[in-house]
Structure formats: C-alpha cells, structure tokens
C-alpha cells in the first residue's frame, strides 16, 4: 500500500492557445517524443476547423471533448470464480483523458489523408455528436447498461 495518494502532475498549457486541454491533445497525438510535429498536426487541424466551421476552434474542441466524455464504464470484478463486468462511474480526470484518447484513436484509424485533416474531421464530428469517438462512448454506455445487474458488486 502507498503511504499517500500519488499526486497528479500539472501539465503546462500549450504555447499558442494557453490551454491545458490542447496541451493534453498534443501529448496524445505525439509519437516518439516528437512534440513539434504533434503541435503542427494539432494547430493545423484547428486551422482547418476555423476555416470550415467559421467558429473558434478552441470552443469547438472543448465541446467535442465534452460530447465524447463517458459517464459510466465497466470494470472486471472477480467473484467466486466468475468474472463480472461491473459498471462504475468514471472520475472526471479519466473522463477527459478517455475522450481525448478516443478522438485521437478514431482519427488515426482513418486511412489515406494527412493526420491534421483526419483529426479536424473527427473533432468536428464529435462536436456534432457523430463519428467514431461518439460511437465508442455509446458502446461503453451500452455495455454499462447491459451489465447493470452487477452494479451491486461495486467497490
């Protein structure tokens, strides 16, 4: 057991928008520590969003993340030789990180176009409550709803 709870690291805000959420997105997009490339991708995606939607890309991104955030998820719990999928509420920091992760994964899964275009498309889709990331959230909620009978196994 730990002596005390591990502290959450503070992520410095990104240089262009001065926003922690955008910094988290950049860190999720980043591969092999290549942050400059990740920043170009994210800011390029934001430019595309600004161009296509004629709205502040930061507000669009914030709303997209808000739309993708899951409320419930299932966690496996072993009880007497059987493993049950127990629905539990998702804590706020995990909600945000899951939402960003799902948006980036959905963008990466698309094929044949530059990443900034795919990311912009996925953020706009999430803003409009459509797209792969929203589908992932709905699937997670459906799983939790289906396993509602095991909710009393929560810990």
UniProtKB/Swiss-Prot annotation:
One of the primary rRNA binding proteins, it binds directly to 16S rRNA where it nucleates assembly of the head domain of the 30S subunit. Is located at the subunit interface close to the decoding center, probably blocks exit of the E-site tRNA. Belongs to the universal ribosomal protein uS7 family. InterPro entries: Ribosomal_uS7 (IPR000235), Ribosomal_uS7_bac/org-type (IPR005717), Ribosomal_uS7_CS (IPR020606), Ribosomal_uS7_dom (IPR023798), Ribosomal_uS7_dom_sf (IPR036823). One of its GO terms (molecular function) is tRNA binding. This is Small ribosomal subunit protein uS7. PANTHER family: RIBOSOMAL PROTEIN S7. It comes from Thermotoga neapolitana (strain ATCC 49049 / DSM 4359 / NBRC 107923 / NS-E). The keyword Ribonucleoprotein applies. One of its GO terms (biological process) is translation. NCBIfam families: rpsG_bact (TIGR01029). It holds the Pfam family Ribosomal_S7. Transmembrane segments: none annotated. Keywords: Ribonucleoprotein, Ribosomal protein, RNA-binding, rRNA-binding, tRNA-binding. Part of the 30S ribosomal subunit. Contacts proteins S9 and S11. One of its GO terms (cellular component) is small ribosomal subunit.
């Amino acid at each position: 057991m730990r002596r005390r709870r591990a502290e959450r690291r503070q992520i410095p805000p990104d240089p262009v928008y001065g926003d922690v959420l955008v910094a988290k997105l950049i860190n999720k997009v980043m591969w092999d520590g290549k942050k400059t490339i990740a920043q170009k991708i994210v800011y390029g995606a934001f430019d595309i969003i600004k161009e296509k939607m004629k709205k502040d890309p930061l507000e669009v991104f914030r709303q997209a993340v808000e739309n993708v955030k899951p409320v419930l998820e299932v966690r496996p719990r072993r009880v007497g030789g059987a493993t049950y999928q127990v629905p539990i509420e998702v804590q706020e920091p995990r909600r945000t990180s899951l939402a960003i992760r799902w948006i980036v994964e959905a963008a990466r899964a698309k094929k044949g176009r530059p990443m900034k275009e795919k990311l912009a498309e996925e953020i706009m889709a999430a803003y409009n409550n459509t797209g792969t990331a929203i589908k992932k959230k709905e699937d997670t909620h459906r799983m939790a709803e289906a396993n509602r009978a095991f909710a009393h196994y929560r810990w």
